[in-house]
């Protein structure tokens, strides 16, 4: 599991973050996304979400997959470093569509758009080299959250405007001074490079991609189905900061191991992958619970074709948490409310902090 990969444990909470899509008052200007010319003989874009089998952030990968597939405006593939199951962090497992090497053989001209989620190993040389190669073939690169580390190491941000998760921002600014780092925008567009803040910024950024490819009416239709009013880049990062009280809550939850529990999320064929990802991500960030999918089937397919691999086992005492029938983007609000009721408002606060999600509606 993801928590075991990071030492000391407090680094875990900042490895990946997200940004909320709630209404805010902070104004931010943004250029529209302009899709590069399609590769020869294509009638619509070929979009790739690259994944490291050893650890790729859950919402960073699943949300763009669900939004783009549901829009029906592009061909989309999840491309992994090697064959086999992709472990998502902090929860879920999926099967990719193909591998980087197989993709290169089948599509030597490259992808039109490459989406880069945050990954456990943000120094993975194979992933970085592959991103660099795709960028050299005129692919648009879209980094989600701390996928920015991989994109930056591939040289994608050199001389360009970019952003990332609030906690990583200052370190990335020091590490990659050739980029122009931008605060207080959920996503930043600079030519054929797009970057976002935290994990949930994948929703507005994905909708902006849908608008660029399929038009505003299509994006509005998809947004309505998600329960989202818009996809503005406006964002106020000021509330997202570490405080002594929050540090104590992380430590207290982590150290109270006798109170840790497993949360089982029932899933059936045709499930909504966005709703599942948001629920699993939230429940697995409390430092008191871990979300698992435990079903008899060897694999389960979402309504948009994502193949989920259930976790092989769970404790007999695992609590079952039904995902409510709400618009997918509202599932996070529901999860935070349930977390507050179960563990207290301070725990729901640190979950929202990790997700860089604004609870001010």
Regions found by a protein language model. Give the residues of each.
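N-terminal secretory signal peptides that target proteins for export/translocation
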Residues: 1-6
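Bacterial N-terminal signal peptides
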Residues: 9-21
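Extended, subdomain-level signal for the structured scaffold at the beginning of enzyme domains
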Residues: 26-141, 149-153, 183, 207-361
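Glycine- and other small-residue-rich loops at beta-strand/loop junctions that grip anionic moieties
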Residues: 53, 161, 191, 195-198, ...
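Short alpha-helices
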Residues: 154-155, 191-212
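A conserved active-site-flanking secondary-structure segment within enzyme catalytic domains
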Residues: 158-184
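Conserved Rossmann-fold dehydrogenase catalytic segment
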Residues: 182-194, 227
């Amino acid at each position: 599991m993801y928590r075991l990969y990071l030492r000391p444990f407090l680094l875990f909470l900042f490895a990946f973050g997200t940004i909320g899509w709630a209404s805010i008052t902070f104004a931010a200007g943004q250029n529209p996304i302009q899709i590069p010319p399609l590769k020869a003989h294509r009638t619509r874009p070929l979009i790739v979400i690259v994944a490291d089998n050893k650890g790729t952030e859950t919402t960073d990968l699943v949300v763009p997959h669900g939004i783009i597939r549901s829009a029906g405006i592009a061909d989309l593939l999840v491309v992994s470093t090697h064959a086999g199951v992709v472990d998502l962090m902090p929860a879920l497992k999926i099967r990719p569509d193909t591998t980087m090497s197989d993709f290169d053989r089948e599509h030597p001209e490259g992808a039109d758009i490459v989406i880069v989620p945050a990954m456990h190993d943000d120094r993975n040389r194979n992933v970085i080299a592959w991103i660099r190669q795709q960028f050299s073939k005129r692919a648009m690169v879209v980094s989600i959250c701390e996928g920015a580390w991989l994109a930056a190491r591939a040289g994608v941000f050199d001389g360009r405007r970019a952003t990332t998760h609030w906690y990583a921002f200052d370190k990335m600014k020091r590490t990659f001074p050739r980029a122009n780092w931008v605060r207080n925008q959920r996503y930043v567009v600079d030519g054929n490079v797009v970057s976002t803040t935290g994990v949930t910024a994948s929703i507005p950024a994905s909708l902006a991609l849908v608008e660029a490819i399929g038009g505003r009416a299509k994006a509005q239709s998809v947004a309505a189905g998600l329960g989202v009013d818009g996809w503005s880049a406006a964002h106020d990062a000021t509330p997202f900061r570490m405080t002594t009280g929050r540090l104590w809550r992380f430590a207290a939850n982590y150290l109270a191991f006798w109170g840790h529990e497993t949360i089982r999320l029932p899933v059936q064929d045709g499930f909504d992958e966005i709703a599942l990802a948001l629920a699993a991500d939230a429940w697995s960030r409390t430092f008191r619970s871990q979300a698992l999918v435990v079903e008899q089937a060897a694999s389960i397919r979402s309504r948009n074709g994502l193949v989920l691999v259930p976790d092989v086992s769970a404790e007999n005492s695992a609590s079952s948490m039904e995902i409510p029938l709400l618009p997918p983007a509202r599932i996070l609000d529901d999860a935070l409310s349930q977390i507050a009721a179960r563990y207290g408002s301070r725990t729901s606060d640190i979950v929202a902090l990790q997700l860089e999600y604004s609870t001010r509606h």
